[in-house]
Amino acid sequence: MKGVAITGMGIISSIGNSVEENYISLIENKIGISRITNISTVHADVIKVGEIKKTNEELVKELNLTEDNNFSRTAMIGTLAAKQAVENAGITSINEFRTGLISATSVGGMDMTERHYYDYFTHPELVKYITCHDGGTADTANDAGL
């Protein structure tokens, strides 16, 4: 291998839903820390976070996922950013190139754990939600065709 080429960028954060929006927000010193509004959690009124201002339902729709998918919120956000990076690179067919994925994200799936933990032991169909606690890299790579 002779080197690595970074050909595209994508980002979804609490201050923007694209590279351009994030850049503008940084220049304008926008603050992305606020109360939790889009995740159902016992911590909603207790802590402030850098929350992505999209609901899980909006993310599912934007990614054209089925209702019964097991993408964690983290995986959906990472997948959206990866789609932006591929588009930013001008790539129309991912398999034309030797492609790798470097993903920098948080742990995923905690939202699924909070939602399904107590029912997990008596409802085997919920296993798919509890086992998705990686950062979503595999889901993102599969969605991109890697």
Task: Provide a role label for each language-model segment.
Residues 1-146:
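Conserved "HGTGT" condensation-loop signature of ketosynthase/thiolase-family condensing enzymes
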